[in-house]
Amino acid sequence: MANQPKNYKKFVATAATATLVASAIVPVASAASFSDIEGNTHADAIKALSDAGIIKGYEDGTFKPNAEISRGQTVKLLGRWLETKGYKVPENWNTVQRFNDLPVNAADQELVKYAALVKDAGVFNGSNGNLNYSQPMQRQQMALVLV
């Protein structure tokens, strides 16, 4: 991933910025209907990522741009983005466990799928074999993911 074109790195940096200021993975609302992003510094990035299907809002029509984001939510965001760039979810995503703390039969199958994609693509390696998907994504961790 380190030898990607500049536009890739710029987009990932923009995605990371939106990620670090947003809780973006819970289903529903479109960017046009987010009731809480008007005037937000990152509103344009949030709208662009929402329009691309990479991030989602909450069922109540909000985006919560200042909420903390978890490592699992970050994995989903990056997985969706990688798909838009032509990366394919591994065929064995639901049979081969990638992280010790995320079994292939976990309730959140979207997380299992995208965890396989980002792990196999070398984007997200976890800590000591664990994804720690419910833990907050720290800025220094995001920096490591982006490099």
Report the location of each language-model feature.
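A short amphipathic alpha-helical interaction element
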Residues: 46-49, 78, 115-118, 146
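Short, intrinsically disordered, charge-balanced linker/junction segments flanking boundaries
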Residues: 141-147
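Feature responds to low-complexity, polar/acidic, surface-exposed segments characteristic
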Residues: 2-41, 56-110, 120, 124-140
